[in-house]
């Protein structure tokens, strides 16, 4: 079952007892101004050699990323979940001692961040996964193999559509669930954003409880999820 609400995450979490969720997979505020992305054009070279000028998504500027998530949030998150995967660990002034997951976005030749780092309470090692995620340049598969990760999705119409400035790909969440969650685990996401995790949980049949405070993002994510669910039903 997927349960998603339009509310503050602290209000959601306070309704649950200690250790209710087996795994929280969250992407809180980093405090780096990601709510006001620049609107610069990109160039995309097709597999047939054609170069396209691609406009960046015209995201509405908002005010949710002026400061990173605080200790009150992390204390509550750790109370309600047995284990956590927390993106943006390098931005937080909070003791998150444990493993790390590094997502290599294969952005070496761009001005975008080369990778993103997550805290992983399930172990103390560092795991690296590679998936191309740079505008129109999206990977065909998510893998630890650097050579395979460089293969692009050739048909750009199959690319994942962006609806949120910090959107993470569905394939990344599927990889996290396959590698770190167990069958029957209850999953928590306190910052739904684009809803990618909801699609991944739907595909892999995990129960998800999630919330999104921003009404615009909430509505867009719910529409995205409903369309995906209808398409899966049809095919």
PLM feature spans:
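Extreme N-terminal starter segment of soluble prokaryotic enzymes
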Residues: 1-4
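Conserved SAM/SAH-binding loop
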Residues: 6-11
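Class I S-adenosyl-L-methionine
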Residues: 14-26, 30-62, 72, 78-235
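Nucleic-acid-processing active sites and adjacent nucleic-acid-binding tracks
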Residues: 63-67
């Amino acid at each position: 079952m997927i349960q998603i609400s339009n509310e503050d995450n602290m209000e959601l979490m306070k309704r649950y007892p200690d250790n209710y969720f087996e795994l929280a997979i969250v992407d809180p505020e980093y405090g780096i101004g990601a709510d006001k992305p620049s609107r610069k054009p990109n160039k995309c070279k097709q597999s047939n050699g054609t170069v396209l000028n691609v406009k960046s998504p015209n995201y509405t500027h908002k005010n949710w990323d002026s400061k990173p998530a605080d200790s009150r949030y992390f204390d509550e998150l750790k109370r309600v979940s047995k284990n956590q995967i927390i993106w943006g660990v390098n931005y937080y002034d909070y003791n998150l001692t444990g493993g790390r997951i590094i997502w290599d976005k294969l952005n070496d030749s761009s001005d975008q961040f080369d990778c993103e780092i997550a805290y992983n309470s399930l172990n103390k090692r560092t795991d690296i996964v590679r998936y191309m995620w740079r505008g129109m340049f999206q990977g065909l598969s998510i893998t630890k193999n650097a050579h395979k990760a460089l293969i692009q999705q050739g048909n750009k119409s199959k690319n994942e559509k962006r609806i949120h400035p910090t959107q993470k790909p569905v394939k990344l969440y599927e990889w996290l669930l396959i590698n770190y969650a167990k069958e029957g685990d209850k999953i928590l996401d306190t910052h739904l954003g684009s809803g990618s995790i909801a699609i991944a949980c739907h595909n892999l049949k995990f129960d998800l409880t999630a919330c999104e405070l921003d009404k615009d993002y909430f509505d867009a994510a719910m529409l995205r999820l409903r369309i995906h669910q209808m398409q899966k039903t049809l095919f």
